[in-house]
Amino acid sequence: MSKQIIYPGAVIGIIGGGQLGKMMAVSAKQMGYKVAVVDPVKDSPCGQVADVEITAHYNDREAIRKLAEISDIITYEFENIDYDALHWLKDHAYLPQGSELLLITQNRETEKKAIQSAGCEVAPYSIVKTKNELKQAVQELRLPAVLKTCRGGYDGKGQFVIKEEAQMEQAAALLEHGTCILESWVSFKMELSVIVVRSVNGEISTFPTAENIHHNNILFQSIVPARVEKGIQQKAADLAVKLADELNLVGPLAVEMFLTEDGELLVNELAPRPHNSGHYTLDLCETSQFEQHIRAVCGLPLGKTDLLKPGMMVNLLGDEVKLVEEDPELLKEAKLYIYGKHEIKKGRKMGHITFMKQPEDEWIQEITNKWMNRDGGQAE
């Protein structure tokens, strides 16, 4: 891989035009880069701020070829991209992140094996392809357990929590979508995540460990710093660095973990891109995850990631985006981000708010109650 420096003024091509691409593009443009984007939706969030918008599917080879022609460097905002298209790009354009890590993280089986090969712990699991294999796996792992499709699925899609044997038949419907993975249910104390970024030159940095709270399998809140001992925070960061080095990472990697009741950290999922749980970095850290992404892939020195002040990020799902209209006082000590999606849907990530003050139990509960009264719901 060439370790060239891509200087401001160059064109950065982004595959994917959602909110992650938009915030990436804004950071790139602030640094003096131009941006081109490919997305199936015209006037996508990223398309609204890009210099060039190509409206086409991600695996449209002609669109990918056009993006390569006009861009000095290519990156992406999410992992479920056509591998063949990315592999073609690797040979015909400058794709510093490569395609191999995406291939690993597109499949939960290969992802689990890669995590274990790096020397990190995961919850006990079994790969299942048939109903008989599912039955056998349940006998070995015991219930409750979570059945997930190996490919696809996000924000709670493509998974089923099996609490009792009577639900086996219902869960088995997931097998129609292909190979699945059955994971033991982890009784965890807390969910944590660390965003680690590694540059083309091997320079590495981590952002502060975030505490994540999910509702309906969708991220609801990220609290920083996580309300755990500093030793646990450091252990989480060390795990992320270990994975980044073992996987030969270029760019950002979100490492989601369970903190068990006995203080162990189990790696749950990886995402080789900017991550929802890292949105707090836009306002609470010296450098955001999006700017760090641009620095890393362009070969620039990484920025400092110190936490400037504690706070909490809360997602705006569906019509929760209207909460600000109903109570403008929410923004008194907060920053608002609206992504620019044209249609409000139940469970759709429409924006987020970052509260810039010390997260205390009482006001965290106040915010939680306000959101729960509206309940943006699970993604459709």
From Swiss-Prot:
Keywords: ATP-binding, Ligase, Nucleotide-binding, Purine biosynthesis. GO terms for cellular component: cytosol. It catalyses: 5-amino-1-(5-phospho-beta-D-ribosyl)imidazole + hydrogencarbonate + ATP = 5-carboxyamino-1-(5-phospho-D-ribosyl)imidazole + ADP + phosphate + 2 H(+). SUPFAM superfamilies: Glutathione synthetase ATP-binding domain-like, PreATP-grasp domain, Rudiment single hybrid motif. Its EC number is 6.3.4.18. Signal peptide: none annotated. ATP binds at residues 108, 148, 153-159, 183-186, 191, 214, 268-269. GO terms for molecular function: 5-(carboxyamino)imidazole ribonucleotide synthase activity; ATP binding; metal ion binding; phosphoribosylaminoimidazole carboxylase activity. GO terms for biological process: 'de novo' IMP biosynthetic process. The keyword rRNA processing does not apply. It comes from the Bacteria. InterPro entries: ATP-grasp, ATP-grasp_carboxylate-amine, ATP_grasp_subdomain_1, PreATP-grasp_dom_sf, PurK, PurK_C, PurT/PurK_preATP-grasp, Rudment_hybrid_motif. Pathway: Purine metabolism; IMP biosynthesis via de novo pathway; 5-amino-1-(5-phospho-D-ribosyl)imidazole-4-carboxylate from 5-amino-1-(5-phospho-D-ribosyl)imidazole (N5-CAIR route): step 1/2. Transmembrane segments: none annotated. It is an enzyme of class 6 (ligase). Residues 112-298 form the ATP-grasp domain. The keyword Cell membrane does not apply. Catalyzes the ATP-dependent conversion of 5-aminoimidazole ribonucleotide (AIR) and HCO(3)(-) to N5-carboxyaminoimidazole ribonucleotide (N5-CAIR). Homodimer. PANTHER family: PHOSPHORIBOSYLAMINOIMIDAZOLE CARBOXYLASE, PURINE BIOSYNTHESIS PROTEIN 6/7, PUR6/7. Belongs to the PurK/PurT family. This is N5-carboxyaminoimidazole ribonucleotide synthase. It comes from Bacillus subtilis (strain 168). The gene is purK.
